[in-house]
Regions:
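Conserved N-terminal entry element of GNAT/NAT acetyltransferase domains
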Residues: 1-14, 18, 22-25, 29
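Conserved acetyl-CoA-binding loop-helix of GNAT-fold acetyltransferases
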Residues: 106, 112-125
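Conserved GNAT-fold acetyl-CoA-binding loop/helix
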Residues: 24-50
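A short helix-loop-beta-strand connector motif used in the catalytic cores of GNAT acetyltransferases and
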Residues: 49-63, 82, 100
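Conserved beta-hairpin
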Residues: 59-75
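Conserved acyl-donor/pantetheine-binding loop and adjacent beta-alpha core of acyl/acetyltransferases
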Residues: 76-103
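Conserved active-site alpha-helix within GNAT-family acetyltransferase domains
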Residues: 117, 129-133, 141-160
Length: 168
């Protein structure tokens, strides 16, 4: 069955919430210390408002993957422009326009069917058309699904490590 990658439409919030909860359950099971399922109440409205607002901002982007009339996945991203301050340009990429992928979510039942790849490919094209010279994203390093997806299937390379320490 084919997948259509398209801009979001009013009414997509419910499907986006369903996909978020589906993929989120995987992460909550994988590492319950760091992940939890959000309350379902109000989630669809929240996604609806966010995705529509993103596409009214020239530097933000949202996409929906539709399969058989249902939301099968979605992606949000935004552009980060070069920093004009020299103090921020020690890291070379901060002097470039960057595409930051905020989220790539695919219904867990549809993983490994090319939906995530199609969403990323469309986002990369959008960023390239707007002058981005690099795309960045983050993922949970303990995921046996997302790490191979990004590193082996889509050509992304690890570039940094994020540290965290609880303060309580």
């Amino acid at each position: 069955m084919s997948v259509q990658i398209r801009p979001p439409r009013p009414g997509d919030g419910e499907g986006m919430a369903r996909v978020w909860l589906s993929a989120g359950a995987y992460y909550a099971d994988l590492d319950p210390v760091h992940f939890q399922l959000p309350a379902a109440e109000g989630l669809a409205d929240s996604f609806e408002a966010d995705i529509m607002a993103r596409n009214s901002d020239a530097d933000s982007y949202g996409l929906v993957a539709e399969r058989a009339g249902e939301v099968a996945g979605w992606l949000t991203a935004h552009l980060e422009h070069p920093s004009p301050r020299a103090s921020y340009q020690l890291i070379r990429e901060l002097g470039w326009t960057r595409l930051m992928v905020d989220a790539v979510m695919v219904d867990r039942a549809l993983w490994r069917q090319g939906i995530g790849t199609a969403l990323l490919t469309a986002a990369e094209s959008w960023g390239r058309d707007r002058g981005a010279s690099v795309v960045r994203l983050s993922t949970f390093p303990g995921s046996p699904v997302s790490m191979p997806f990004y590193e082996q299937h889509t050509g992304y390379q690890r570039r940094s490590i994020l540290f965290q320490k609880p303060l309580s």
